[in-house]
Amino acid sequence: MRKEFLLVVFLIGLLTKATIAQTQAKRIEKVYTNPLKVQLGDPFVLFAKGTYYMYGTGNPADRGFSAYSSKDLVNWKPEGQIYAYNNKNGWSDPNTPWDGAYWAPEVYEVKGRFYLFYSAQWKVNPAKEMENFKIGVAVSDNPTGPFVDLAPKPLFDPGYPIIDANVFFDSDGKSYLYYSRAAYKHPVESEIASHARKSGKYKEIEESWVYGVELKPDFSGVKGEPVLVLRPPVKLKDKQAAWESLSVTTGEVNRRWTEGSTTFKKGGIYYIMYSANHFGGEHYAVGYATSRSPLGPYKKADENPILHKNTDRGGIVSGTGHNSIVYSPNGKEMYCVYHGRTTTTGSERVVFIDRMKVENGKITVYGPTTKPQKMPAVSPNGK
């Protein structure tokens, strides 16, 4: 009898250990760690048909764009190439610098169809400009393509190179395109430029600026003239000058950037997040500005930058920027999706996803993180 009792106790013990081990395993499964296993720059995430789709700049696409899919925002499956330059309405030239500069794709679902906004080198280039970037729009019946350009030409030509398209759909039915005027051949005088000249760093400073313009409902063009929305600070005493000018003041390059914008609206306030400094350097970082109108004027936040490198604080992440925004599967949690680099990934841009919140008119991004984080919530109760 005693032996039988001991055997029962032993078996219960084994069962308890197994249950504990399974519980611990489940707990381990409910966390994730940055960076994700996706090598892309300028990541944009769309939620459609119950699935997340990620688009971005870089491999494995060949002169175009590829996509990834996920159910939980963490584990991503390659979906292959979704857009190629040589579709029947292709207007770009892959035989140009940066292999055609197929950059920063963003996809939006409108009335059951999917629209891809992107930038590339326009083949109409009589002046042989090195940076002849324009923005195009392609369409597909599926988020994974194939996408075909709406027309055999860019969306519009403002007369200067443009990149980093972002579209905001307002509650009144209007839609707006935000883009970055490339810094190429755009020297700008400022106190920062004057200081760089006097210190012997650079003779001139080129700048990229963010513009906004209303889109035609069918995305065949724009309505009215573009409006300047954001630019680097002019005065040295400006609160934003120090962090937005690091590419210049550290001797990295003679350019200042305002690019990679993403716009959303909450509580009647328009928020535009943007990236500053050289995308290839350690100082690439994210700030934001607010307005009561989609085309401004916008006021930059005093607490900028809200997402930047942590290598100066004992971390391993730098070059954080060009973000998009997405919500968890249960729609409750807000996430910032962005690219960065780590001391182990080197020069390759990899994708990060970190929680963010908007409270009392202020944006907070809880990143960059590289330690285990709780998985995005799936159920309504946050689990």
What is each PLM-predicted segment?
Residues 22-383:
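Carbohydrate-active catalytic/glycan-binding domains of CAZyme proteins
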Residues 1-25:
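Bacterial Sec-dependent N-terminal signal peptides
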